[in-house]
Amino acid sequence: MLRWALIFFIIAIIAAVFGFGGIATAAAGIAKVLFYLFLVVAVVMLVSALLAGRNLTR
């Protein structure tokens, strides 16, 4: 159990370094772009599946 506590402590330290170091701002920008990109892809796939008349869940 102590091993897991140390692992999560190290992960928390690494996350703090990234969060307070300014890298989080760049990552958030990239995440927003990817979110909207995949949202558009999902909508296009949904519309194309509906127009083709196929079952959405294979």
UniProtKB/Swiss-Prot annotation:
TM region(s), chain numbering: 4-24, 33-53
Disulphide-bonded residues: none
Transmembrane helix listed as a keyword: yes
GO cellular component: plasma membrane
Compartments, record wording: Cell membrane
Keyword 4Fe-4S assigned: no
N-terminal signal peptide: none
Superkingdom of source: Bacteria
Membrane topology: Multi-pass membrane protein
Keywords: Cell membrane, Membrane, Transmembrane, Transmembrane helix
Family listed: Belongs to the UPF0391 family.
Protein name per UniProt: UPF0391 membrane protein GM21_0108
Annotated source species: Geobacter sp. (strain M21)
